[in-house]
Amino acid sequence: MRANFCLFIFILLFSCGQTYNTDNEETQFLNDFVEDDTTIEKTPLKTIKINTDAGREIVDEPKISAFFQIFQGENLIEEHNIGIEIRGSSSQYFPKKSYGFETWDEAGEDLDVSLAGYPEEEDWILYGPFSDKSLIRNVLIYRLSNLVGRYATKTSFYNLQINGVFLGLYVLMEKIKRDKNRVNISKNRSDDISGGYIIKIDKITGDGDTLNEKIAFMSEYTKDGIKGINKNVHFLYEYPKNRDISDEQKNYIQGYMRDFEDAIASENFTSESDGYKKYIDVDSFIDFFILNEITRNVDAYRISTFMHKDINEKLKMGPIWDFNIAFGNADYCEGGLTTGWAYKFNEACPADGMLVPFWWDRLMQDPNFTQALKERWTSLRLNELSNSSIMGIVDELVGELEDSDAITQNFGKWLILGTYIWPNNFVGNRHSEEITYLKEWIEGRLSWMDQEISKF
């Protein structure tokens, strides 16, 4: 309810005078809010240009046909036929949209291509950072995930132009799907239905926005671990898609999740042979926990939460997804604090419509799990997740944007520095202030986690 209320207020504010520089002209805003570094020679980002057939407006379903090009300056690098649509949930309320698109052949059929040097595929995303005025939160956490050995989508910064209109900074990303270069699990075949599967805990979008057995199944435990249907935790079929998954496959993955939940809810849940370890890859759960907790992601464990299972293997968490309101960028449900655990969301916002599954509380009650978590944390803090490692990536990403003048161009288009955009916990007048806040928040968060995990 609170999220919907905030979105309503957001829309109301923007309908009452919020303006954008749609022509990308020079404005006093640039002098007031973006650092003056005009004496430094810039190397512009590559530009993606998309032109829809007959200039049609891009909508949220169905995808419409368009022509996609990548330019370096005036030089054309590559071009493709695509089908494109608006994507996202709450982000669709923002004037700066994000897009999902497929690369197509001339007949409009899916076509795998090595887009921008990425491994061949046909499903892609153009993410437009808006409420995240650092511009780098998603890219940062995906880099960190890959650094600790957990696949996360590849990312690249681009300027975007659609039908001749400049739209600012975007991130070209891989869509999460089953593929040897993405979520590397086997195709689900009729001769062995033990895998692969991708399921996710998420909001219901599409299909009439109605929770039904065609698209999802529900947890059989309440947030407190009591047996009973829980409409606050439901599992969506991601692979095979709900239109493709057979009843036999549904029964298998539903049964597997039911057995896992029964095991972790049982009195002997720590048993090596009959407890939760029989069903899950513990190391993947630990890494997923760490990546979500260092960001205190307010959506963690309950929204945009992916899991996957391969043939004859245990359930694994991940890949991680959607951290634009993480790293202290949420002003509700304690999302802006550097203290407290994200997995304790249910205590902060018990009336929310999307709650954290009871498993995480249960896992943290197992001394063997917390000891393994402590050992993994200690190792990562000495290397991949050290302060210097994380700050080095932040500086690298910001440097790339500064060197290309992308920051000035983006905030020349979208005049939002110094303005609250839902659900900002901090509002900086300059981009550099947003980065300083991000760095200080991360350092505070890491310090708190060091102290708490040392007590395990």
Q: How should these model regions be labeled?
A:
Residues N4-L13:
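Sec-dependent N-terminal signal peptides
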Residues S15-I40:
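Bacterial Sec-dependent N-terminal signal peptides
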Residues D60-E61, L111-L115, R137-N138, Y170-L172, ...:
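Short, solvent-exposed loop/turn and secondary-structure capping segments
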Residues D105-G108, P119-E121, G128, G149-Y151, ...:
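Internal "kinase-insert"/substrate-recognition segments embedded within catalytic cores
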Residues F130-R150:
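A conserved alpha-helical element in kinase catalytic cores
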Residues V148-N159, N297:
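Short, well-structured beta-strand/strand-turn elements
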